[in-house]
């Protein structure tokens, strides 16, 4: 059974990766920054929870090369779930993997769009370029890799688009970006994590791009809103934000506030997630494992109805 280390294992998608790794009985490690007096109680509690489940947590900085090398010599698979602001720091992981010499697979922090095939507005493009640089460094070092394009984190974007969780300042207006007809892919985070752990250990996925594009999870904003209204019994006022407004905001807002609007434009206006055909060498994840199945969008919305969905959060860009 492969030993798996997850960088960013206490972050948003990283938490799902850790739990998925444990669910498949992999010895699981996390490399995380040391806690500080400013660390939140939830951060402390999460680490205690993971330790109680058998996770080995190594605290260290990305610049601690010798420490990382010694840790990597104890594991087989490296998964990076680092957030946007730390994308470039993955070069330290690459250098440590090269020095350790034993790693069977490295999965860099992709998990969103397929960055080598799209060209979004400049603020988001600058983020993707950092990811491309990491990919090229992996290839130049001849490291065994798998690139995962998981598309949209399902619960994250349901929270963002539909704001289903009740709170005092809740606004029942729903913003529709562009016409609302553009198709995108919505995958539940728990499924993304399970498939990622599987592909990380699957010889068929070595040095390949794996795209999570299950046909049943391709949907438009208008379809998603209609499904949610029918399921929740609620009715919403729809406010359209046209293409031109998103482009203007991407130009006028300061960094990093201009990045989220550029992402919204890429997904919901340009349709970048569905803008390319699968290549012969691509692997579509839903065809790989008969014992696994992606949660349908209907099933994802049921999690919100029952109160079992992840709470709202926002990605970090600085």
Swiss-Prot record:
GO annotation (BP), single: phenylpropanoid biosynthetic process
Substrates-to-products reaction catalysed: eugenol + a carboxylate + NADP(+) = a coniferyl ester + NADPH; eugenol + acetate + NADP(+) = (E)-coniferyl acetate + NADPH
Pathway entry: Aromatic compound metabolism; phenylpropanoid biosynthesis
Chain sites annotated for binding substrate: 260
Residues the UniProt record annotates as site (Confers substrate specificity): 84, 87
Annotated tissue distribution: Mostly expressed in petals, and, to a lower extent, in sepals, stamens and pistils.
Binding-site list for NADP(+): 10-13, 32-43, 47, 83-86, 109-111, 131, 151-153
Protein name as annotated: Eugenol synthase 1
